[in-house]
């Protein structure tokens, strides 16, 4: 492939594919990937420092915790019965 460097047109076939700068660039690319991978694993509060807030993060920040269960109702439970079944189909009397 032809490219321009310092105002000169150069052909990439004239350079070795294993030149030192390519090897060092590859090494530093791998090193930066590993560092960023472990930073994101260990640092879970990246978004909080930048002003982003999740709606679930801001609900109970004062230590109250979520609300408790509503009080139990006493008396007969009448809402457990479902609707009545539909009538039988056919109706021919066989």
From Swiss-Prot:
One of the protein's GO biological processes: calcium ion transport
Compartment(s) of residence: Endoplasmic reticulum membrane; Cell membrane
Annotated protein name in UniProt: Selenoprotein K
Subunit structure: Interacts with DERL1, DERL2, DERL3 and SELENOS. The SELENOK-SELENOS complex interacts with VCP. Interacts with ZDHHC6.
Record-annotated site: Cleavage: 81-82
Keywords from the UniProt entry: Calcium, Calcium transport, Cell membrane, Endoplasmic reticulum, Ion transport, Membrane, Selenocysteine, Transmembrane, Transmembrane helix, Transport, Ubl conjugation
A Pfam family: SelK_SelG
Stored PANTHER family: SELENOPROTEIN K (PTHR16875:SF0)
Post-translational modification: Cleaved by CAPN2/m-calpain in resting macrophages but not in activated macrophages. Macrophage activation up-regulates expression of the calpain inhibitor CAST/calpastatin, resulting in inhibition of CAPN2 activity.
Membrane-spanning parts: 20-42
Membrane protein topology class: Single-pass membrane protein
